[in-house]
Amino acid sequence: MNHQQKKEQHSGVRDQEIRAALDQHWAASDANDFETEHLIYHEDAVLEYPQSGERTRGRCNIQNQRASQPSKKRFAVRRIIGSGDLWVTEFILKYDGRPSYTVSIMEFKGDKVARETQYFADPFVAPAWRAQ
């Protein structure tokens, strides 16, 4: 096996490990298991919500911010794609029973998330001009 093949094999194993960690993260998120949900983050991770301008620094602060939300959340993962250090999850977040279509972009450093950016969109009725 040459150097390139070894590198690709290692990359494939790492991708499988990250995917398993993501599956565990989203399952814990859906169960409102805040301890397990936040194991995926580096201690100095950054979480950004560009739509509101919020930026939370540090795994403990991210966990505390999410744990302080007054209602339980539900997560329905629709798709996870990625490789290497960049992974994207598309999911439906239900908060107080209202769905929000959400995209999470996670940037990994090693086996932990260093930065996550999330975008949220409420459902809407398609305009008549697009109904063809």
Regions found by a protein language model. Name each.
Residues H25, L47-E48, E90:
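Alpha-helix C-capping/helix-to-loop hinge sites
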Residues M1-L39, E43, A131-Q132:
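Short, low-complexity N-terminal intrinsically disordered segments enriched in polar/charged residues
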Residues I18, L22, R59-I62, P99:
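A structural signal for well-ordered alpha-helical scaffolds and beta->alpha junctions
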Residues N2-V13, Q63-Q132:
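A beta-strand edge to alpha-helix "cap/lid" segment located at domain peripheries
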Residues A28, E35-T36, S52, D96, ...:
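Hydrophobic alpha-helical elements and their junctions with loops/disorder across both membrane
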Residues D30, A45, Y95-G97:
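Flexible interhelical turns and helix-capping residues at alpha-helix boundaries
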Residues D15, F34-G84:
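A solvent-exposed, acidic/Ser-Thr-rich amphipathic alpha-helical stretch
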